[in-house]
């Protein structure tokens, strides 16, 4: 019911919305406008009053800096909802922000989910969205949405491989003729990169750093493949021996060591999917290359590592972070196009049938 109050009052009929409900961030796509919301999946709540103090960017700034009665919550873990009530309240905020003060028609809403999601989890997402007032609900697997957003024509009889590395999951899939041929969902992704960096700093330097600091290291000097020109960065944390603040300089070589385990797991999973891919589609992938999407794909050298392990050209999609959200919204248009093609095909088939048989078919349909 949390979305019903919004959709029921502002939507009529006809618009299309795509929502990428990710572990690390939420993106909302509106047809004709593009991505209108792009914010972290974070909420800060006052535990004493159960009041939301901030959502998204503002809440993210509070991580690690709040007093005891205020908690910063990330309500999604490993691609699925871990705190349903907080997720509802977060979604309400983002949808209101996307819609603004201008009413739009009652929408068709597409929501992307990890390829490993259970039927129960999928049904919960669909029911919540439909109760919110959606005219129609489409549930899309993240690799399919990522492929569409990356500009791949998924309707062709040709194999395409997509590796979508989000915050909580890495989805790897081979897609052909509009569907997934073989896929896997790995619970190793961007959040695990951060955790690996935190663990490394604690073990090697006796330094405790927070999520924000780990993410900054990952973005600025993180690496999955040896750099030709090493880089470094100063970081501050708490010395676990003295308990006092301490500054140190961290190098990209250290980041290569810290991140070796999670990036190797992803590269091995890609190799494993290729081994399960039918020969004809594997040949297509060898010719066309592997496409990487999601924020995690931007880790320096990860594309090179996968290319080295698979011996297949690996490329990062343009605007990799937005691919899933763009594809989620555009899937609605894709589905409508497929329906039109199907209708035209049925019409051609009917036109080739004698008129007396056509009448019999129509009467049975009626």
Where are these regions (language model features)?
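Nucleotide/phosphate-binding catalytic cleft detector across ATP-hydrolyzing
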Residues: 1-165, 173-291, 297-366
């Amino acid at each position: 019911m949390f979305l019903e109050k919004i959709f029921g009052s502002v939507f009529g009929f006809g618009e299309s919305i795509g929502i990428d409900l990710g572990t690390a961030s939420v993106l909302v796509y509106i047809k004709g406008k593009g991505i209108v919301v792009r914010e972290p999946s974070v909420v800060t709540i006052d535990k004493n009053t159960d009041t939301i103090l901030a959502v998204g960017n503002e809440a993210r700034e509070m991580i690690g800096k709040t007093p005891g009665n205020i908690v910063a919550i990330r309500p999604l873990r490993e691609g699925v909802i871990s705190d349903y009530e907080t997720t509802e309240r977060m979604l309400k905020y983002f949808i209101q922000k996307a819609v603004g003060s201008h009413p739009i028609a009652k929408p068709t809403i597409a929501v992307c989910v990890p390829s490993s999601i259970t039927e129960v989890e999928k049904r919960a997402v669909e029911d919540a969205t439909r109760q919110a007032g959606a005219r129609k609900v489409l549930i899309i697997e993240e690799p399919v949405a990522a492929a569409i957003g990356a500009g791949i024509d998924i309707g062709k009889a040709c194999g395409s491989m997509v590796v979508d590395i989000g915050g909580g999951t890495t989805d790897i899939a081979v897609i052909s003729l509009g569907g997934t041929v073989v896929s896997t969902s790995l619970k190793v992704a961007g959040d695990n990169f951060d955790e690996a960096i935190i663990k490394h700093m604690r073990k090697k330097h006796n330094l405790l750093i927070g999520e924000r600091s780990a993410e900054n290291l990952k973005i600025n000097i993180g690496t999955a493949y040896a750099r030709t020109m090493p880089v470094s960065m100063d970081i501050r944390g708490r010395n676990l021996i003295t308990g006092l603040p301490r500054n140190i300089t961290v190098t990209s070589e250290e980041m290569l060591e810290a991140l070796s385990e999670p990036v190797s797991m992803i590269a091995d999973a890609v190799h494993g999917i290729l081994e399960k891919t039918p020969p004809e589609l594997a040949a297509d992938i060898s010719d066309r290359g592997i496409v990487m999407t999601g924020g995690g794909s931007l880790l320096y050298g990860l594309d090179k590592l996968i290319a080295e392990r698979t011996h297949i050209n690996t490329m990062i999609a343009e605007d990799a972070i937005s691919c899933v959200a763009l594809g989620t919204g555009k899937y609605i248009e894709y589905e409508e196009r497929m329906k039109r093609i199907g209708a035209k095909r049925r019409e051609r088939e009917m036109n080739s049938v004698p008129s007396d048989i056509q009448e019999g078919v129509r009467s049975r349909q009626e």
